[in-house]
Amino acid sequence: MTDTLFDRRDIDALLGGRHPDPFACLGPHGEAGRTVVRALLPGALRVRAVTPGGDELGALACVDEAGCFAGTITHDGRYRLAIDWPDAQQVTDDAYAFGTLLDDAALARFAAGDPAAVLDCLGATPIRVDGVDGVRFAVWAPNAQRVSVVGNFNSWDGRRHPMRLRRPWGVWELFVPGIGPGEHYKYELCAADGSLLPHKADPCARATEAPPRTASVVADTAALDGFGWHDAGWIDARPDAGRRFRVPWSIYEVHAESWQRVPEEMDRSATWDELAERLIPYVKGMGFTHVEFMPISEYPFGGSWGYQPLAQFAPSARFGPVDGFARFVDRAHAAGIGVIVDWVPAHFPNDAHGLAQFDGSALYEHADPREGMHPDWNTCVFNLGRNEVSAFLIASALAWARRYHVDGIRVDAVASMLYRDYSRKEGEWVPNVYGGRENLESVAFLRTLNDALHGAAAPAGVVTIAEESTAWPGVTAPTGDGGLGFDFKWNMGWMHDTLAYLHEDPIHRRYHHDRMTFGLVYAFSERFVLPLSHDEVVHGKGSLAAKMPDDAWQRLATLRAYFGFMWAHPGKKLLFMGSEFAQWSEFAHDGTPHWDLLDAPAHRGVQRLVRDLNRAYASEPALHALDCDAAGFTWLIGDDRDNSVLAFARRDDSGRVVVAICNFTPVPRSGYRVGLPAPGQWRELMNTDAAVYGGSNAGNDGAVWAQDVPAHGQPWSATLRLPPLATLWLAPA
């Protein structure tokens, strides 16, 4: 009789991994006045149904030696399965005794592109259902024939836990009782053609194994969401849209994996708690306002530096448990330091366990390689025109802002998103619906992203920054005015022009003077960050110090002068780790900055200069309040190419003023007249040639007096001694 309790067609479909609805046959089913319980437990020797208290309700007979069991019970309440395995016994609730888990309305919102629905529905969530603790798994895979969740809890056997398809929305769900946070898992998917795919990590995993292992990990979401934050005052004080452009931003860019290692433990990377002990005091002591991390969401290949992530919701396990990052941010905020994370929505790697061909189809990426493959990085390009993909990515950004309290999101590779022909030759790209090269889906996505991060869905005060290297108009213009809606944009043109100028021998700089002045032609067309980032100190480009010509003294002097120019120039500041003490070697992701250079006075001097520049920049409103407003800048000397001298005034709207004078030759210049906007004594606020910074200590004895001699469009002026390869800042005494 037992063979009639389990239809042969169901058995064959389940064992073949192609059953369209496992809940239709597995679990309890009322039939002809009785309850039939069916279970698929490959490898089990004996199965019984028992009450929660352990009383036996009935045996489930083996109806197929591959692991199909069935039996009848008269009990109509909760039951459990008592399973005898070859080497163990187990008592567990039946995963197929629970009803649907996800709300239809929430799934409909997900299909419509609502990021909040991604956060509410997808991933692995420890929950209690009908008094039973377990984990709800949910994954989007609309084109799969079958999806199972696999892990240590079922010996990674995809036959054990096939999931329920919520067909209209393409989401598969299953509640697995008796497991919880810390459980390792993946998904086993059978493609529409019946082929078995490699096990896939959860796209919405909140935690992962440390590479090179690739499993997802069930995170304690209740603990994460209930983390004991102490930064309410910091969050409340974050500047709103009207003020955030008027405050100082000096950003220290960090590769968390290599900033400082632990040599006693095989040079492993520091954990978040260790970084909190070391990095936060360092950033604070150096006067930086923010730390920006290169991508920290989980990434399989260390050589990508994080720019090929595969777990957009999970801090990398390289740095310890995910709540360690929350503790880091909390401690940074307590120290007055903001935290920015790099975030990568442009592309993803094609690792077998990742998003590529996730359900056997081009689900997250474009199917056409002219749209779906990035030629520079051999990575997959997100299909941002698909509601679910857009919602997935925006939900990730919101999760970093909401769950981890980050202060800013820097969006990587925006230019590659905006142009359909980016790095593609003729015939290798697909025009938009109007025949143009603009990627209209990316434009819509970026606007939606910025509106979400600046709206009610995110905590107040979250800032967005674009790495955008072209002249696309309105990157920082409001979305309502047709812009992309970013708060800031990296000024890549300024960086390339000024570094190219400084690479020239000083005797030739006169022929390239425009490279130092051209940036002011467009400096206020967008709100800019001046980035001396990791991209400029890798792949044979040399470190900042190594880019400068001549001997070591002149190289460091030129770098100091450049820093003085940069910190006085309109725009927020960003400096990559190691550059603050003039490291000679390039960035090496598998190494660490050469901290031993700080044993040398010359390198300590550069580090001290950066500290003092940061402090002066932050304390002097004239240097930051109108960073994004043309009213805050006046050229005094922009055309002295023969002497390679520049001079300009920075001011705030109250009338405070700082004048910067730069001499980019090794020739000291005495009696050099510079126009000044006010009479009286002017003190040297900064001299990058000071002895404490490793310079020759030339200058003006700390102060000059303005004379009633008009010059450079100003009613007063002073004659100065310009130190070699140096920048001076003057402020009214």
Swiss-Prot record:
<keyword id="KW-0119">Carbohydrate metabolism</keyword>
<dbReference type="GO" id="GO:0003844">
    <property type="term" value="F:1,4-alpha-glucan branching enzyme activity"/>
</dbReference>
<dbReference type="InterPro" id="IPR006048">
    <property type="entry name" value="A-amylase/branching_C"/>
</dbReference>
<dbReference type="InterPro" id="IPR054169">
    <property type="entry name" value="GlgB_N"/>
</dbReference>
<dbReference type="InterPro" id="IPR006047">
    <property type="entry name" value="Glyco_hydro_13_cat_dom"/>
</dbReference>
<dbReference type="InterPro" id="IPR017853">
    <property type="entry name" value="Glycoside_hydrolase_SF"/>
</dbReference>
<dbReference type="GO" id="GO:0004553">
    <property type="term" value="F:hydrolase activity, hydrolyzing O-glycosyl compounds"/>
</dbReference>
<comment type="pathway">
    <text>Glycan biosynthesis; glycogen biosynthesis.</text>
</comment>
<dbReference type="GO" id="GO:0043169">
    <property type="term" value="F:cation binding"/>
</dbReference>
<dbReference type="GO" id="GO:0005829">
    <property type="term" value="C:cytosol"/>
</dbReference>
<keyword id="KW-0320">Glycogen biosynthesis</keyword>
<feature type="active site" description="Proton donor">
    <location>
        <position position="467"/>
    </location>
</feature>
<feature type="active site" description="Nucleophile">
    <location>
        <position position="412"/>
    </location>
</feature>
<keyword id="KW-0328">Glycosyltransferase</keyword>
<comment type="function">
    <text>Catalyzes the formation of the alpha-1,6-glucosidic linkages in glycogen by scission of a 1,4-alpha-linked oligosaccharide from growing alpha-1,4-glucan chains and the subsequent attachment of the oligosaccharide to the alpha-1,6 position.</text>
</comment>
<dbReference type="InterPro" id="IPR014756">
    <property type="entry name" value="Ig_E-set"/>
</dbReference>
<dbReference type="InterPro" id="IPR013783">
    <property type="entry name" value="Ig-like_fold"/>
</dbReference>
<dbReference type="Pfam" id="PF02806">
    <property type="entry name" value="Alpha-amylase_C"/>
</dbReference>
<dbReference type="InterPro" id="IPR044143">
    <property type="entry name" value="GlgB_N_E_set_prok"/>
</dbReference>
<dbReference type="Pfam" id="PF02922">
    <property type="entry name" value="CBM_48"/>
</dbReference>
<dbReference type="Pfam" id="PF22019">
    <property type="entry name" value="GlgB_N"/>
</dbReference>
<keyword id="KW-0808">Transferase</keyword>
<protein>
    <recommendedName>
        <fullName>1,4-alpha-glucan branching enzyme GlgB</fullName>
        <ecNumber>2.4.1.18</ecNumber>
    </recommendedName>
</protein>
<dbReference type="InterPro" id="IPR006407">
    <property type="entry name" value="GlgB"/>
</dbReference>
<dbReference type="InterPro" id="IPR037439">
    <property type="entry name" value="Branching_enzy"/>
</dbReference>
<dbReference type="InterPro" id="IPR004193">
    <property type="entry name" value="Glyco_hydro_13_N"/>
</dbReference>
<dbReference type="GO" id="GO:0005978">
    <property type="term" value="P:glycogen biosynthetic process"/>
</dbReference>
<keyword id="KW-0321">Glycogen metabolism</keyword>
<comment type="similarity">
    <text>Belongs to the glycosyl hydrolase 13 family. GlgB subfamily.</text>
</comment>
<dbReference type="InterPro" id="IPR013780">
    <property type="entry name" value="Glyco_hydro_b"/>
</dbReference>
<comment type="subunit">
    <text>Monomer.</text>
</comment>
